[in-house]
């Protein structure tokens, strides 16, 4: 069966967007690599943004000078860029497999809207557009960092973080109700390559994106307070404490969003929790390296406690997610349509008829006109009753009488 014109248009749009995504992926892979080597057009090494040798938490920011605050050092920035690149590589393989799977599955289209449902299951054009926006914004972020523009880099990374949040939600929910997602998944032919891509490879890619979102939450928190610390007359220690507290609060909203909304679509979404553990390790490294600086500013205990709360909250949220998974497995509240045999049994049940007994005090003497009218009604009553029964009850055949005696 051929797909509808609407589905064909959706598939062509998705394919063109996928080509743009592949081109943007190549560019996003080239930019970080070339930015690490000198004499290739980048003025500075983007990983080394601040000099922690001059870190002083009791000083205020200096005008016309980059004041060092809490940020990622070159090893941590390299780990972050590498993990994001690995996730993008896996997503590149996933979309390539998805295109091949859709080409093979088009031969098994059985409905007018099957093709658009399969495209949405793999990744709608909206999801691809958000992925392209992510790849573009991370390139701009690296280029801006190489020029040491911390204010512009914070704004660009805010756009990147917003695109990452929307992209993660789109990958999990497809921005559709649960029943629409279930209907799209049920339309996929079983034991096919498309089935393997959607139900096995896509959850892996989605969890990788969620893990990268946790790392991006850390970089976003540090970027915001790096820009604030170099824009206003604030103490450096306050900016460090503010960055840690922002990274402590933002994941709580995601934990709530996961249990309220995202868990209905993807139960095994542990990628964000794993990313939070990695981000906590990255955040605690400056506290260990520059312990003397934090101790001299009397912020070591406060920052250490706040940083320690982050993995504790993550562990609690992860434990809640595991408990809810086991609870849903025990309940087994998957609803299925009512079978046709149950409907036939309900229709074949005999219906009780009301008994018609004359009242004891009724007057038996009637006039001739009333008696004649009553005789006519008695003659017409069986006909009307038969018509009523035939109009309400289903017509039974010999085979049905044998099944339902």
Curated annotation (Swiss-Prot):
Residues 346-405 are annotated as: Disordered. Its main location: virion. Pfam families: Herpes_glycop (PF01528). Residues 386-397 have a biased composition (Polar residues). It comes from the Viruses. The chain crosses the membrane at residues 18-38, 77-97, 122-142, 150-170, 193-215, 246-266, 268-288, 300-320. Interacts (via N-terminus) with gN (via N-terminus). The gM-gN heterodimer forms the gCII complex. Envelope glycoprotein important for virion assembly and egress. Plays a role in the correct incorporation of gH-gL into virion membrane. Directs the glycoprotein N (gN) to the host trans-Golgi network. This is Envelope glycoprotein M.
């Amino acid at each position: 069966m051929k797909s509808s014109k609407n589905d064909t248009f959706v598939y062509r749009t998705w394919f063109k967007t996928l080509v743009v995504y592949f081109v943007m992926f190549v560019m996003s892979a080239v930019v970080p690599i070339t930015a690490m080597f000198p004499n290739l057009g980048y003025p500075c090494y983007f990983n080394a943004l601040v000099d922690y040798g001059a870190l002083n938490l009791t000083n205020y920011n200096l005008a016309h000078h980059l004041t060092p605050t809490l940020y990622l050092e070159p090893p941590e920035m390299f780990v972050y860029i590498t993990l994001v690149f690995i996730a993008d590589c896996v997503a590149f393989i996933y979309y390539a497999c998805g295109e091949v799977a859709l080409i093979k599955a088009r031969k098994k289209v059985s409905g007018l809207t099957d093709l658009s449902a399969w495209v949405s299951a793999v990744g709608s054009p909206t999801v691809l557009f958000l992925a392209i926006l992510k790849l573009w914004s991370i390139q701009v972020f690296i280029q801006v960092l190489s020029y040491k523009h911390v204010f512009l880099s914070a704004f660009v990374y805010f756009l990147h973080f917003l695109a990452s949040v929307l992209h993660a939600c789109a990958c999990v929910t497809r921005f559709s109700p649960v029943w629409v997602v279930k209907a799209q998944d049920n339309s996929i032919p079983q034991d096919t390559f498309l089935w393997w891509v959607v139900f096995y490879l896509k959850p892996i890619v989605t969890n990788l994106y969620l893990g990268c979102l946790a790392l991006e939450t850390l970089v976003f928190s540090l970027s915001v307070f790096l820009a604030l610390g170099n824009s206003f007359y604030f103490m450096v220690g306050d900016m460090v404490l503010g960055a840690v507290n922002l990274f402590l609060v933002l994941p709580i909203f995601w934990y709530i969003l996961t249990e309220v909304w995202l868990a209905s679509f993807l139960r095994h979404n542990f990628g964000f929790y794993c990313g939070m553990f990695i981000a906590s390790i990255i955040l605690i490294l400056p506290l260990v390296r520059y312990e003397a600086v934090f101790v001299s500013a009397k912020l070591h205990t406060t920052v250490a406690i706040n940083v320690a709360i982050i993995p504790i909250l993550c562990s609690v949220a992860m434990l809640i997610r595991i408990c809810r998974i086991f609870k849903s497995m025990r309940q087994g509240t998957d609803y299925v349509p009512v079978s046709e045999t149950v409907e036939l049994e309900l229709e074949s049940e005999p219906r009780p008829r009301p008994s018609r007994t004359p009242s004891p005090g009724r007057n038996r003497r009637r006039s001739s006109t009333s008696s004649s009218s009553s005789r006519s009604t008695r003659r017409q009553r069986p006909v009307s009753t038969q018509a009523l029964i035939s109009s309400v009850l289903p017509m039974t055949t010999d085979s049905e009488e044998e099944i339902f005696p």
